[in-house]
């Protein structure tokens, strides 16, 4: 059975995460994962190039080595394993899955806060602290979005949860009740 890219990402990320913890390189591997993410974002076709059968294996290996020269031995071995199993095209999925595991371990969540007007840093910090406390998290990293259509209030989205405290949502609920 062929695994989808998401499942591949999960498996490889779990293995790397576990090994990083075991080798007490948790933070340094996370830093290297972030560096890899930047490399793959800057070069979106890199994974495809490293799995392309029309290129010689030696050229691909040399490219991989030049890419990973500044990384730890653990990360170099991991990248070599991913390369040997021809999974470099799935590297963005591996990176995303590793970031998710890291965030879970550290008690970090990402949230999108939508408001009718731009919120200042103090307001965003209060929302972040309040949501972190409510959810038992250490930190909530907020992306702020302005959408005048919500009229007022905020809509917070995080980890498949939506807390809709917008005026538009309240008006829609009242309208729904009146039309019954």
Curated annotation (Swiss-Prot):
An annotated Gene Ontology molecular function: proton-transporting ATP synthase activity, rotational mechanism
Subunit structure as annotated in this protein's UniProt entry: F-type ATPases have 2 components, F(1) - the catalytic core - and F(0) - the membrane proton channel. F(1) has five subunits: alpha(3), beta(3), gamma(1), delta(1), epsilon(1). F(0) has three main subunits: a(1), b(2) and c(10-14). The alpha and beta chains form an alternating ring which encloses part of the gamma chain. F(1) is attached to F(0) by a central stalk formed by the gamma and epsilon chains, while a peripheral stalk is formed by the delta and b chains.
GO cellular component terms, A-Z: plasma membrane; proton-transporting ATP synthase complex
Gene behind this protein: atpH
Family of this protein: Belongs to the ATPase delta chain family.
UniProt subcellular location: Cell membrane
HAMAP family: ATP_synth_delta_bact (MF_01416)
Name of the protein: ATP synthase subunit delta
Organism: Latilactobacillus sakei subsp. sakei (strain 23K) (Lactobacillus sakei subsp. sakei)
PROSITE patterns named in the record: ATPASE_DELTA (PS00389)
Keyword set, alphabetical order: ATP synthesis, Cell membrane, CF(1), Hydrogen ion transport, Ion transport, Membrane, Transport
Topological type in the membrane: Peripheral membrane protein
Origin superkingdom: Bacteria
The protein's role, per its UniProt record: F(1)F(0) ATP synthase produces ATP from ADP in the presence of a proton or sodium gradient. F-type ATPases consist of two structural domains, F(1) containing the extramembraneous catalytic core and F(0) containing the membrane proton channel, linked together by a central stalk and a peripheral stalk. During catalysis, ATP synthesis in the catalytic domain of F(1) is coupled via a rotary mechanism of the central stalk subunits to proton translocation.
